[in-house]
Amino acid sequence: MEFKEGLTFDDVLLVPKYSDITSRSQTNLSTKLSRNISINIPFVSANMDTVTESSMAVAMARAGGIGIIHRFLTIEEQANEVLKVKRSGSVMIENPYSISSEKSIKDALDYAEDKEISGLLVVDSNSKLVGIVTERDLLFANSNGSISDIMTKDVVTAKPGVALDEAKQILHQHRIEKLPIVDDSGIIKGLITSKDITNNADFPNASKDKKGSPLVGAAVGVKGDFLERTESLLEAGTDVLVVDIAHGHSENAISAIKNIKKAFPDCELIAGNIATAQGTEDLIKAGVDAVKVGVGSGSICITRVITGSGVPQLTAVMDCAKIGNDYGIPIISDGGTRTSGDATKALASGASSVMVGSMLGGTDESPGTVLTKNGKRFKVYRGMASLAASIGRKSKETGSFSFDDDLNDYVAEGVEAMVPYKGTVVDILKQLSG
């Protein structure tokens, strides 16, 4: 058996050297997330069910990074989370939500609540714009009434191609918050809102796609419905997919990568997790656009304890980055990042970006409710190979969970914990970015 030295973040320090930078404002943190996607800060929120859904992904994109929506949702739910992110920051919303004028007020209330929006465009049987209903219209209205009775019928609109400055002028002139974009035949082509214009100005460093919408990623598995899930996520506007499996250097992962790339050759694909140079090369040859590195290094991951397998994270990143550089494929360091210094070391050792989980768990934007214990506030944070996460997945997939049957077949490689409530993720990202 051959033994080699392996280093983790705590084993090294960066040697200070001369710098000609006189202000932090002179630094540029932009980097490659994958072969064809760049982000403005090198941070990615982990695809974990206690870290990233739409709220976290929106915050990450606004700060200049990107969030990866976890896959432990139904296909429809996960695609809807992607849509929420895409609609949160686009100057013009394509395919805005609309409802038939024949529907009831209750239908409108239920639809608006489900989509988490404050207003709806109203269309006739020919899909032409006939009105608009807002929160104020729906407030205290008789739920049995018709939308056509309460909607605003004289709707101010603009033509496709309207300039942003002109749209702002129209919104101000008419004291309205929503401006439907309608063609000559009355068909809706988009929607501009005052909130989206404000967000666009407030977050100049935001990570955006070519259409100006926030960047967002989503995870898929390697078995079952992964191709169907991939198709739905891409249709929803997902910018990058992450093939998510604990041991990425495996036949299951490589087969899934090849199948996804064959069915969707233009999709941007990240895969992992791996921890060796050979694993990196095999995934790259299978067709990935970035490789996620880290086995057992996460704060709530016990893979190394249970399986005796893993590579210290700094060494793993260095080994994998050498291969990534040869092929021009970015490396994402995933795991072991407990401080901003750890992130710096990961980048210095060859990673293009850093996936963070534990640092973001417990924030306002992470899924879950705030719990109070002994006068202190906490949120749940768990590894995706933990028993609790497995129970949650099994229950979603089958609608039930048998403690006698299912527990006998499962070996946990992660744990669940309560982490202190941390407030908004914005402050953490500022600390990470310096």
Please describe what each predicted stretch is.
Residues 1-18, 22-25, 100, 159, ...:
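Alpha/beta catalytic cores of nucleotide-metabolism and tRNA/nucleoside-modifying enzymes
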Residues 23-40, 46-48, 77-115, 122-124, ...:
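Bateman/CBS regulatory modules and CBS-like beta-alpha motifs in cytosolic regions of diverse proteins
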Residues 25, 74-83, 187-207, 225-228, ...:
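Active-site-adjacent beta->alpha loops and helix N-cap segments on the catalytic face
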Residues 38-44, 91-96, 209-219, 260-275, ...:
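Short beta-strand/loop segments at the ligand-binding rim of alpha/beta enzyme cores
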Residues 54-57, 108-109, 147, 167-168, ...:
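Generic hydrophobic/aromatic pocket-lining and core-packing "Φ" positions
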Residues 55-58, 228-236, 275-293, 333, ...:
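Catalytic cores of alpha/beta
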Residues 62-77, 184, 238-250, 289-307, ...:
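Glycine-rich phosphate-binding active-site loops on the catalytic face of alpha/beta enzymes
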Residues 69-72, 98-99, 119-121, 157-159, ...:
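Catalytic beta/alpha-barrel core
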